A protein has these predicted regions:
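Glycine/aspartate-rich loop-and-adjacent alpha/beta segment that forms the canonical ThDP
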Residues: 1-83
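Thiamine diphosphate
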Residues: 70-248
Length: 248
């Protein structure tokens, strides 16, 4: 079992011992081009680092956060972003969002990730020709919202800037573990040491004729999750401004 209170119903002590002998770390050491002394020294440094961090964490385990500190660790500080209305022109939601993505993807750290967002141009044609210009910044994925949301969360924690597209808002239910239990909580659980600045874009609601599993408005499910921010643009200008603001 996986619990610390495991009663060894599934495995005996003897079986556990046999598996410990197959420890992948030990097995991998045999393949390294290092002598035994170098490996021991490396192990010692890693163990010292882990012990130091472990003890440091336990020294703080009884500290009680104030309400202000709690808020600080749930949400990062948002920059003051000025939006200029110069150069206005007629547009649609599709074109406005594409403009925003085109400007965002000029950032070398930006990655657009999702199903059919590349050569296909997006399920609703939003990404369109962007793949021709930003193929290195666009990652097309298999049809598994849970999997590629996990990739996006991991990238965000590692410092990359991810814009994830969920084909239909209904499929946020499949991505909810990564969003609710990891992306939304990592800053708080690490006391501000880690963060996950990612953006998810998903079409919500009916009107596409694709049935009950593709036309729901599920944003209310996520409204009460600390660490998540939800925006719903009411016009093309706001759609572009909010997407860029969310990224920045």
């Amino acid at each position: 079992g996986h619990s610390k209170s495991d009663k060894r119903v599934y495995r005996s002590v003897e079986e556990e011992k046999k598996w410990k002998e197959k420890d992948p770390l030990t097995a991998y050491e045999r393949k390294l081009y290092m002598d035994r002394n170098t490996i021991r020294e490396l192990r010692s440094k890693v163990r010292e680092f882990v012990d130091t961090e472990f003890n440091r964490a336990f020294e703080k385990k009884d500290e009680v956060l104030t309400l202000e500190e709690t808020k600080e660790y749930v949400y990062g500080t948002a920059p003051d972003i000025k939006v200029h209305k110069s150069g206005m022109h007629p547009s649609t939601y599709r074109l406005a969002i594409r403009e925003a993505l085109s400007e965002i993807l000029r950032d070398e750290k930006a990655t657009l990730i999702g199903e059919d967002v590349g050569k296909y141009g997006g399920c609703f044609g939003v990404t369109g020709p962007l793949y021709n210009e930003f193929s290195e910044n666009i990652l097309e994925t298999p049809v598994s919202e849970e999997a590629f949301t996990g990739v996006a969360v991991g990238e965000g924690i590692m410092g990359e800037r991810v814009i994830e597209e969920i084909m239909y808002g209904d499929f946020l239910t499949l991505a909810s573990d990564g969003l609710v239990n990891h992306a939304a909580k990592i800053r708080y659980m690490s006391a501000g040491q880690l963060s996950c600045p990612m953006v998810i874009r998903a079409p919500i609601g009916s009107g596409t004729g694709h049935g009950s599993q593709h036309t729901q408005s599920l944003e209310g499910m996520f409204l009460n999750i600390p660490g998540l921010k939800i925006v719903a643009p009411s016009d093309p200008f706001t759609a572009k401004a909010l997407l860029k603001s969310a990224y920045e």
